[in-house]
Amino acid sequence: MQIINTIAHETIWGGEKLTPYTDVKSNKIGHLYSLVSNGEYESKILNGKYRGQLFKQYFDENKKRLNLNNYQEFPFVLALVDASDDLSLQVHPNDKIAKELEKTDFGKNESWYFIDAPKSGKIYAGCKAKTAEELKEKVSNGEYEAIIDYLEVTNGDYVYIEAGTMHAMAAGSFVYEIEENCNATYRVYDFDRVDVHGNKRPLQTENALKAIDVNKKAKAQKYNEEKVERLYSTKLFRNISSYTNNSETLECLTIIEGEDIIENYKIQKGTTIVLEPKETVELNNIDFIVSRPII
């Protein structure tokens, strides 16, 4: 069993909900990374045999034993996300576009579980433009409202955002996020906001227009069963006191409610525990989401 350190990431749209679960004193924490190994951020293991190691090293040394040898790198990133403001209108590339623009094997699909739904009751998801040509024309003219589509969401909803879908999380969202391990995000529009220095964040309009599929939509689903996507599966567990990994690969338990002490470490919202096959963890009636790589 490996307990993973959390990593706070401040953003222009972040808030205060994650501040109690990190040593970073900020009212702008957008992401609390629960498990990440993407070159920019690297999780560490806090306990046991691998204490002090980067998760990347653990994965590289053990992936064959864990039936994950088909992955060059760990396939997903886990985080809690606090959006006190709307995120930028953006898109992630599919595999084909990612290979062309990023020289990587995979694009990025992602899933959101809404612990708290946005204040408006809807997120940005999908595109109203009927063709790529119409999309390009509207973006060139700054007519963003003409192309933005919306999706209604409520507390407890699960939303799968497929690569190529134009999207943005909306203000008030508090989300468990699992995303494929690709760093590529192309901003279409950032609502003309500026940072503390008065600067706008850069847009990646040309790449975004290549990556957006105007036919891609998203839908909200109830999270009452295991969700199996391309590179990962997830399942929600509530009020659990003991959990055993009965799979043939590692599983990641990310706490979304409750706290406990395990091996002298405080386990709380945002903490991820990695269990190898047949390992068991005893917990104090905790709510968590189990994620597992597809093998």
Can you describe what each PLM-predicted range is?
Residues 1-130, 185, 191-219, 234, ...:
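Transition-metal
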Residues 73, 82-86, 117-120, 165-185, ...:
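Ligand-binding loop in jelly-roll beta-barrel domains
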Residues 78-79, 87, 110-113, 150-151, ...:
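His/acidic/aromatic-lined binding-pocket segments of jelly-roll/cupin-type domains
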Residues 128-141, 247-254:
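Short, basic/aromatic beta-hairpin or loop at an interaction surface
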Residues 138-147, 158-160, 166-216:
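An exposed, glycine/acidic-rich loop-and-rim segment of catalytic or binding clefts
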Residues 148-160, 261-281:
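Short acidic-glycine-tyrosine-enriched beta hairpin
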Residues 231-237:
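A surface-exposed beta-alpha-beta supersecondary segment
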